[in-house]
């Protein structure tokens, strides 16, 4: 089953340049298609994982990134989430709305080996941008696999970088990394750039219900009951350790959106990048409302939309809204 957007690369399966391009990038897209081998000639492949909630709109015109699949338990069923997996965003949220809870697990080192080894056997190095270590033990699995592969392929580089980001924030960092790779940065230069700039990705999330936060142990049952009664929409952010924290407790959806925009007004640094990402967990109308609120305050912002996938959605549930932008600090 194909993943809900059309990005094709999945551990070496699919088209090298199979993503969609917008009109403005037509000339660049033609160049990429004609010179498809240029991706290989750069000497290394860029990987991330399915926590990075990319979309065609967000990645339009960018060189393709390969995504390592992740496992999601939904109710009593286990799924593989990825472009060639058996779980779509639509099915995931439909099941959640039907009363099922979800959980995720860190990526098995053997899954990493299967993905990375294809590049190494082709004579390419590997740079993997990993889901935040503050939210998962996935980084440990990646480092374990990387060490084994370095021993098996001593002539090749296998580099793992902790993004300290999640969801559409991770996606925005990966997008910029893909662009800079295509512009000619070496694997060492790009790894250093990611480490230097990862904390400049600012994440502000709001959730519509306490139900999934309570189930995941992020809030107590008593706090969830009071918050639900008062119509509180928890405001979460990713801190400098890459951990998801409850920051504020606005009441009602409109106030939550105003709070997100207020944080952006206080911290957005447009000279670092005008790209802003709005993510939504199966609530496109609310996502559009947040997008328009951002554009009203910041008409020059390049606002793009993306779905929040099952990896983060497992812990936040339907109705999550994310606002991601470049800033000097979190």
Q: Where are the model-predicted features located?
A:
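Short terminal hydrophobic/aromatic SLiMs and anchors at protein ends
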Residues: 4-7, 21
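Short, Lys/Arg-enriched N-terminal segments with co-localized hydrophobic residues
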Residues: 15, 21, 25-41
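Mixed-charge interfacial surface used for oligomerization/domain docking
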Residues: 39-41, 45-72, 76, 127, ...
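Class I S-adenosyl-L-methionine
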Residues: 78-142, 147-151
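Short non-domain terminal segments
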Residues: 8, 17, 30-32, 90, ...
């Amino acid at each position: 089953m194909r993943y809900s957007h059309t990005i094709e690369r999945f551990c070496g399966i699919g088209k090298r340049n199979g993503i969609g391009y917008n009109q403005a990038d037509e000339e660049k897209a033609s160049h990429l298609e004609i010179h498809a081998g240029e991706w290989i000639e750069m000497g290394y492949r860029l990987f991330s994982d399915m926590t990075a909630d990319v979309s065609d709109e967000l990645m339009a015109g960018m060189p393709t990134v390969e995504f390592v699949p992740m496992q999601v338990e939904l109710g009593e069923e286990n799924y593989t989430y990825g472009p060639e997996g058996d779980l779509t965003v639509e099915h995931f949220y439909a099941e959640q709305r039907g009363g099922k809870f979800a959980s995720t697990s860190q990526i098995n080192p053997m899954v990493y080996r299967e993905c990375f080894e294809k590049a190494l056997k082709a004579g390419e190095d590997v740079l993997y941008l990993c889901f935040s270590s503050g939210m998962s033990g996935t980084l440990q699995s990646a480092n374990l696999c990387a060490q084994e592969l370095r021993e098996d392929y001593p002539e090749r580089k296998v580099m793992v970088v902790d993004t300290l980001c999640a969801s559409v924030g991770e996606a925005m960092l990966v997008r910029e990394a893909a662009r800079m790779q295509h512009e000619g940065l070496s694997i060492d230069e790009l790894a250093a750039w990611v480490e230097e700039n990862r904390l400049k990705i600012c994440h502000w999330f709001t959730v519509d219900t306490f139900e999934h936060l309570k189930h995941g142990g992020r809030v107590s049952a008593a706090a969830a009951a009071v918050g639900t009664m008062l119509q509180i929409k928890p405001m979460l952010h990713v801190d400098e350790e890459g951990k998801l924290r409850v920051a504020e407790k606005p009441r009602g959806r409109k106030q939550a959106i105003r709070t997100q925009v207020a944080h952006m007004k206080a911290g957005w640094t447009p000279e670092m990048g005008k790209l802003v990402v709005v993510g939504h967990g199966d609530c496109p109308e609310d996502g559009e409302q947040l997008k328009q609120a951002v554009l009203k305050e910041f008409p020059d912002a390049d606002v793009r939309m993306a779905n929040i996938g099952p990896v983060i959605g497992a812990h936040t549930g339907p109705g999550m809204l994310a606002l991601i932008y470049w800033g000097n600090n979190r």
